[in-house]
């Protein structure tokens, strides 16, 4: 049995108008980018046009971010959200990717008092924390009202943040306006993987 992978990143929220040309014909666009600096794979996942950012809890009470959308048009919002995840494959001697992912999520919980963090992309790029006043100035209105304004650079490793920023800059060519100061980033989003059975030609 083996499993040495974990995907860690953020949930991105932007106005529908930025993603409509992708989500209307495709609903969920699957975008992949290999980051310039660290060459990590960065992918989009779970795209929700007109959706809501949500909070869910893992074992041990760890709060992480997720998202969903409703089939009922009357329940849809003016925003689209999706995960942007950095794929991480660890090598020996480390072999506890689930523990690592939980640890990163717990850092976010520590800084928010147990909830999900939100930051404007513009504040992240300027190296400053998003606070209540800066969030109030955002033209993108957060759909997760309980999210706590903060600074994701205190939570996500430099490798992950750099890869996410580089991918967002690249994806902006496909969806102009994505790489905007008012784009909202929620953290942490973590995807774990089950152990795989190692087989050979005899089994």
PLM features: residue spans?
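Residues forming the flavin
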Residues: 1-203
